[in-house]
């Protein structure tokens, strides 16, 4: 088959014109990259430094108990710096031995004076060091995440206060239900965000110590002072006393952390989806604040597409998938199965960081259109007040009788495209029970927002009390 090269060239140009802008937009979006601070926590330099810090702390603990010479512990501590792990040497050694920890130990030991290198990693197993390093990294990552969530919480509190009394349509199953206030909707976001913060704080109470129990968790390589060495190591690292049981083959604390990240992700995914939908042309009640120069489409100049809210939905799904993989670590083989991968812990933290960095500007500066909210309330011509009408009529003719009567009125109003109030007035047998002033009040949506404004006050008060307990 003969290929028309001119046509092929045009197709390539079209593909580039369409895909390159999309690629550029995606990498430059607020959610495209994690912050440098979060990235550095899991970067190679910091990861290796943490490993050296743990090994040095182990040496100091063992020296205190007379297990290794103090001079060796001093030298190991003095050389606990990644400058003694040149990348080229490390890569060459890893290629030779095929084991990351052994490669680190071998290269590092060459820089030790005397025989101090012989006492590096004394009695420990690789998983002891790595699992402890993951705890340190996750706790550092959690601090960033909690601070971001707290900052977002403050923005949401301001928003809830501002729109405490702003009526909007409450929707169930995608249909108009009853009026609420926008402040009440934001209050739901505040409460869910705070519950996730408390979950993460609780999780950190358990994810607060490392492990040093040897190859199969029996302390065999550490001897009779194994318990003391482990406890001293955790004290040297500023961690809590160790768990008495081996958890190399369990990983439930990591799984819990992953699931809390998933919950955080899904909360913001829901918020993002809500803003995405409320911004749609057919609803138009809120809008992401965009610069006047923003371009929504390469072919449709009128488009003002939601970007950050979409990012929240996408990232929430990815975070949940990482949590599922981390959960699988719990199904280990015997005492330890080596089926876990630190990459998943790193990725779930980086993506949660990206998600929160997208959420911060979105929720701090969003356009809200109260007039459109009121237009949407009036769109169904009073049908949303059917519940209140039913309760008022129910006092006169009985609740169940009133329910059926109002249901029939609602269907008639919907079919004839008239207001529910007019449908009532067209039925003298029902209208006789209601005075004009009573009817006017029944169909005033502001008179049927329940305790929505007071609910906002209660949510904010409860949240402010919990904010006083934040220490991270």
Model-derived features: positions:
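Long, amphipathic alpha-helical stalk/connector segments used for oligomerization, subunit docking
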Residues: 318-399
């Amino acid at each position: 088959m003969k290929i028309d090269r001119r046509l092929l060239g045009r197709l390539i140009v079209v593909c580039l014109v369409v895909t390159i802008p999309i690629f550029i937009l995606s990498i430059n979006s607020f959610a495209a990259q994690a912050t440098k601070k979060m990235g550095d926590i899991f970067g190679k330099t910091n990861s290796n430094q943490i490993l050296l810090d743990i090994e040095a702390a182990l040496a100091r603990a063992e020296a205190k108990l007379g297990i290794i010479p103090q001079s060796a512990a001093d030298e190991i501590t003095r050389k606990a710096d990644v400058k003694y792990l040149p990348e080229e040497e490390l890569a060459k050694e890893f290629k030779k031995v095929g084991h990351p920890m052994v490669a680190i130990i071998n290269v590092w030991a060459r820089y030790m004076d005397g025989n101090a290198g012989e006492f590096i990693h004394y009695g420990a197993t690789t998983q002891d060091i790595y699992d402890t390093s993951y705890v340190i990294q996750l706790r550092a990552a959690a601090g960033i995440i909690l601070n971001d969530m707290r900052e977002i919480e403050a923005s949401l509190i301001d928003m809830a206060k501002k729109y405490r009394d702003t009526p909007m349509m409450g929707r169930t199953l995608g249909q108009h239900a009853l009026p609420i206030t926008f402040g009440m909707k934001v209050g739901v976001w505040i409460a869910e965000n705070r519950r996730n913060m408390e979950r993460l704080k609780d999780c950190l109470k358990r994810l607060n110590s490392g492990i040093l129990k040897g190859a199969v968790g029996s302390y065999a390589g550490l001897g009779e002072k194994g318990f003391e060495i482990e406890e001293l190591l955790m004290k040297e690292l500023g961690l809590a006393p160790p768990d008495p049981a081996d958890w190399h083959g369990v990983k439930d604390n990591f799984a819990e952390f992953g699931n809390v990240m998933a919950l955080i992700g899904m909360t913001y995914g829901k918020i993002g989806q809500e803003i995405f939908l409320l911004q749609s042309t057919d609803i138009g009640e809120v809008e992401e604040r965009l610069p006047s120069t923003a371009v929504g489409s390469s072919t449709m100049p009128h488009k003002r597409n939601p970007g950050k809210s979409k990012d929240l939905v996408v990232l929430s799904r990815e975070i949940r998938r990482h949590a599922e993989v981390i959960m699988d670590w719990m199904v280990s083989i015997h005492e330890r199965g080596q089926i876990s991968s630190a990459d998943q812990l790193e990725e779930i933290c980086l993506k949660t960081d990206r998600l929160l960095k997208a959420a911060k500007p979105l929720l701090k500066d969003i356009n809200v259109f109260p007039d459109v909210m009121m237009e949407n309330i009036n769109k169904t011509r009073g049908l949303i007040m059917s519940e209140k009408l039913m309760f008022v009529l129910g006092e006169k003719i009985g609740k169940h009788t009133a329910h059926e009567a109002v249901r029939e009125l609602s269907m008639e109003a919907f079919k004839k495209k008239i207001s529910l109030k007019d449908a009532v007035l067209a039925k003298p047998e029902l209208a006789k029970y209601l005075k004009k002033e009573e009817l006017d009040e029944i169909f005033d949506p502001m008179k049927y927002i329940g305790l929505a404004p007071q609910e906002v006050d209660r949510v904010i008060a409860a949240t402010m009390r919990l904010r006083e307990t934040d220490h991270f």
